[in-house]
């Protein structure tokens, strides 16, 4: 992604098409052709379309869950394969961002030194631990959802987690650097975009919930989305204070943190209603 994220001049295409295709081009391994002009207009369109990437991942998750269900694969192995698929689909870039941010925050260093650690390509103990904990939490929660006959909720985790990425880049945040990916996207996301996506995902999930499990669970996805946004907002304020701004690693960390939070919340909610 970083290799495609340097500001260039040129003309823009239609906003919707450019945003969706470029989001998929930058933030997934899918062979989709994106924009050829890179600036803050491009960045804003990509961030507005960010949950589309999660929706695509969610559809692929549904296909994988259906296939593994037919084959009789255990919930634990199913969860492992689902989380691996998510990471492969995004080239593990959000995992890398989580590791970098954890190393920098875990250093408790002054902002200047913390930014140097954030830019260091090597992963330390804090970064490794954060990655391990996040993956373990997601695998365990997804396994619980599959075992609890709530696999449909798993399909919404990728899209909901990207609301956290949007919050990390909301209007009011300052890019850590005047160049690169963060400079194009940080501070571009309007809160009504996030709200619109939350409503859209909530309505869609409500329809699926009524079909798959009954009306009693329609509240889970909207609540999970709100919690993801609150957690990401808290994290965004913290990294802004510690680093003096936000970059692409912070957005990736926000997505990964939100995925873990959403997965746990959904698993606990389902367990509480069925236990």
Curated annotation (Swiss-Prot):
Location(s), subcellular: Cell membrane
InterPro entries in the record: CobS (IPR003805)
HAMAP family: CobS
Protein name listed in UniProt: Adenosylcobinamide-GDP ribazoletransferase
TM region positions: 52-72, 73-93, 126-146, 181-201, 208-228, 251-271
BP terms from Gene Ontology: cobalamin biosynthetic process
Pathway per the UniProt entry: Cofactor biosynthesis; adenosylcobalamin biosynthesis; adenosylcobalamin from cob(II)yrinate a,c-diamide: step 7/7
Disulfide bonds: none
Catalytic reaction equation(s): alpha-ribazole + adenosylcob(III)inamide-GDP = adenosylcob(III)alamin + GMP + H(+); alpha-ribazole 5'-phosphate + adenosylcob(III)inamide-GDP = adenosylcob(III)alamin 5'-phosphate + GMP + H(+)
GO molecular function: adenosylcobinamide-GDP ribazoletransferase activity; cobalamin 5'-phosphate synthase activity
Span of the signal peptide: none
Keywords: Cell membrane, Cobalamin biosynthesis, Magnesium, Membrane, Transferase, Transmembrane, Transmembrane helix
Main subcellular localisation: membrane
GO cellular component, one term: plasma membrane
EC number: 2.7.8.26
Protein role: Joins adenosylcobinamide-GDP and alpha-ribazole to generate adenosylcobalamin (Ado-cobalamin). Also synthesizes adenosylcobalamin 5'-phosphate from adenosylcobinamide-GDP and alpha-ribazole 5'-phosphate.
